[in-house]
């Protein structure tokens, strides 16, 4: 603790750089661009392989691809984070999903993952998931005689359409960078612009949680650090 200008960020920059030099995986959640310089330095030092900086700019909005993994491994946490993310976009806070809707969404995610693992020509992202639900999964529901009141696929697609292709938020979950954060050791999420946005902030929060949980579960024996500024 200390007042503004007392050197907190200066000290923390030095600390996390030393941890990074020693092989630690570091995830920083920041407001105020305190770690932009260090992140750029690491990005340059590693030839672009590390030092990943997420922020929102009008001409370069923040974007992710939560469906992408380099090794096509989708463990329980990864599948659950995808379902949680879609539920967050689909349902309002005061509108809890029915059990039948949760089951239908879980099945859709599982079948979609099965399809992209089998056919790796399909690019994993929200666009291809949306297409899968609209075509393949609609047929699955019809074959199983799932009633509209149990899962309204047209309503589902309508609510999520803004995140598809040329929709208002079509950029958000369709990043073409094919960036798997599991093996990136220095990641900064700059939240200054998105922290008050009711659409972007919940999505970014889920991505942060999933990223660190994935590291905790899969990178055994490696030191990890999550640091939240202004917590």
What are the residue ranges of the model-derived segments?
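P-loop NTPase motor domains
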Residues: 33-49, 58-231
């Amino acid at each position: 603790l200390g007042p503004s200008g007392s050197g907190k960020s200066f000290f923390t920059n030095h600390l996390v750089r030393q941890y990074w030099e020693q092989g630690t995986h570091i995830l920083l959640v920041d407001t105020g661009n305190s770690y932009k310089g260090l992140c750029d330095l690491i990005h340059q030092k590693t030839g672009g392989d590390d030092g990943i900086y997420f922020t929102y700019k009008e001409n370069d909005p923040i974007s992710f691809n939560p469906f992408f993994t380099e090794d096509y491994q989708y463990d329980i946490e990864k599948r659950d984070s995808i379902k949680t993310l879609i539920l967050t976009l689909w349902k309002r806070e005061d509108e809890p999903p029915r059990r039948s809707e949760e089951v239908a969404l879980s099945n859709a995610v599982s079948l979609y993952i099965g399809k992209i693992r089998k056919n790796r020509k399909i690019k994993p992202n929200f666009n291809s998931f949306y297409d899968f639900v609209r075509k393949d999964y609609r047929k699955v529901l019809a074959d199983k005689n799932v009633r509209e009141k149990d899962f309204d696929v047209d309503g589902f697609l309508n609510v999520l359409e803004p995140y598809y292709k040329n929709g208002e938020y079509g950029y958000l979950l369709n990043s073409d960078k094919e960036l798997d954060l599991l093996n990136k050791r220095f990641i900064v999420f700059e939240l200054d612009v998105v922290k008050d946005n009711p659409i972007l902030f919940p999505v970014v929060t889920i991505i942060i949680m999933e990223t660190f949980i994935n590291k905790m579960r899969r990178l055994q024996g490696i030191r990890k650090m999550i640091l939240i500024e202004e917590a």
